[in-house]
C-alpha cells in the first residue's frame, strides 16, 4: 500500500467558503488566501458552491444559483488568476459549470449517482468525488471506475496512476458515527489511495450533521488535528473551507477556519510531509 506522502506533482490545496454569499465576500476571502495561492509548493484551487442543494432546512440559505454563481466565480478567476472548484448536484449542471471550474466536485451524498458521475466525467474538468459518510472506503473504487471508464472505455480496473492521469480524485470527509456525529478512520486514506489520489476534507470531517436545530454544527478546533494526522498518513491534498468571519457565515461556519489559521496549518502539514 502507498504510505509515502504526496504523489501528485504538488500538494493540492482547495480552500474557500462553503457557499457563495456575495461577490464582495468572495473577494475578501480570495485576497486573504493570496499567500497560500502564491506558494510555489502548492497547487491551489479556490472553492465555493453556487447552490447548497442538501441543506437540512428549507429555510436555510442555498446560494445565488447556477448562472449568477458561475459569473461570480469567473470574476474571481479573472481577477486573481485562481483555478476554481465548485460542486454540481444534477447532471445538466456539469457541462455549464465546467466552462468556469477546473475541478467539478460530486457531493458525498451523491457519490454513487452514476448519471452525475458520467456527466461530470464527460467534461474536461478534474473529477473530485467525495466519499459518502455511509460508504466503505473500499467501495469508492466503483465510483472511480465509473469516471475512468467514461473517460477511457478500455480501462478495466481503477489504480492510482490511472486515476491521476485521467483526472479522477477522491475526497475523505468522515464517516457517520451514530446520529449527528462523524469520525475519521485514517485507514480510509490509505485504502482509497490504492485506486485514486486522495484529498482530505478537514473541515467537513468535524461537522455534526443536523446538530443545531435544523442546520449542521461542528467544532473547527479539531480540523487542524485531523489534517496533521492525515498529512502523516499520506495524502495528495487538503480541502478546507475558510471564511473571514466564520461565526457569521451563511453555511457551515462552525467548521470553517480563518485564512490565517489555514496558513499556519498548511505550514505544519508541509513540515510533516518533509519528514517522510
UniProtKB/Swiss-Prot annotation:
Annotated keywords: Cytoplasm, Lipopolysaccharide biosynthesis, Transferase
Superkingdom: Bacteria
Recorded GO CC terms: cytoplasm
Source species: Helicobacter pylori (strain P12)
Family matches, as PANTHER family: PHOSPHO-2-DEHYDRO-3-DEOXYHEPTONATE ALDOLASE
UniProt entry tagged with the keyword Transferase: yes
Family of this protein: Belongs to the KdsA family.
Coiled coil: none
Pathway entry: Carbohydrate biosynthesis; 3-deoxy-D-manno-octulosonate biosynthesis; 3-deoxy-D-manno-octulosonate from D-ribulose 5-phosphate: step 2/3; Bacterial outer membrane biogenesis; lipopolysaccharide biosynthesis
Keyword Oxidoreductase applies: no
One matching Pfam family: DAHP_synth_1
Record localization: Cytoplasm
Protein name: 2-dehydro-3-deoxyphosphooctonate aldolase
Catalytic activity: D-arabinose 5-phosphate + phosphoenolpyruvate + H2O = 3-deoxy-alpha-D-manno-2-octulosonate-8-phosphate + phosphate
GO BP term (any one): keto-3-deoxy-D-manno-octulosonic acid biosynthetic process
Catalytic activity, EC: 2.5.1.55
A Gene Ontology molecular function term of the record: 3-deoxy-8-phosphooctulonate synthase activity
Entries under HAMAP family matching the protein: KDO8P_synth
Amino acid at each position: 500500500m502507498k504510505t509515502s506522502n504526496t504523489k501528485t506533482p504538488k500538494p493540492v490545496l482547495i480552500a474557500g467558503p462553503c457557499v457563495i454569499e456575495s461577490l464582495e465576500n468572495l473577494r475578501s476571502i480570495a485576497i486573504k488566501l493570496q499567500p497560500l495561492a502564491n506558494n510555489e509548493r502548492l497547487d491551489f484551487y479556490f472553492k465555493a458552491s453556487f447552490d447548497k442543494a442538501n441543506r437540512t432546512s428549507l429555510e436555510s440559505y442555498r446560494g445565488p444559483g447556477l448562472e449568477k454563481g458561475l459569473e461570480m466565480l469567473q470574476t474571481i478567476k479573472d481577477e486573481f488568476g485562481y483555478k476554481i472548484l465548485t460542486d454540481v448536484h444534477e447532471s445538466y449542471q456539469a457541462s455549464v459549470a465546467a466552462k468556469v471550474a477546473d475541478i467539478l466536485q460530486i457531493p458525498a451524498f451523491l457519490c454513487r449517482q452514476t448519471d452525475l458521475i458520467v456527466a461530470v466525467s464527460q467534461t474536461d474538468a478534474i473529477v473530485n468525488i467525495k466519499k459518502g459518510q455511509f460508504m466503505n472506503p473500499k467501495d469508492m473504487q466503483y465510483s472511480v471506475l465509473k469516471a475512468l471508464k467514461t473517460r477511457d472505455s478500455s480501462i478495466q480496473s481503477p489504480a492510482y496512476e490511472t486515476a491521476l492521469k485521467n483526472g479522477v480524485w477522491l475526497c475523505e470527509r468522515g464517516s457517520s458515527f451514530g446520529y449527528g456525529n462523524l469520525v475519521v478512520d485514517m485507514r480510509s486514506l490509505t485504502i482509497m489511495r490504492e485506486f485514486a489520489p486522495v484529498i482530505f476534507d478537514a473541515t467537513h470531517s468535524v461537522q455534526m450533521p443536523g446538530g443545531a436545530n435544523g442546520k449542521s454544527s461542528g467544532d473547527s478546533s479539531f480540523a487542524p488535528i485531523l489534517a496533521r494526522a492525515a498529512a502523516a498518513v499520506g495524502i495528495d491534498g487538503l480541502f478546507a473551507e475558510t471564511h473571514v468571519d466564520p461565526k457569521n457565515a451563511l453555511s457551515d461556519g462552525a467548521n470553517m477556519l480563518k485564512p490565517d489559521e489555514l496558513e499556519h496549518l498548511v505550514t505544519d502539514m508541509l513540515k510533516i510531509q518533509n519528514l517522510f
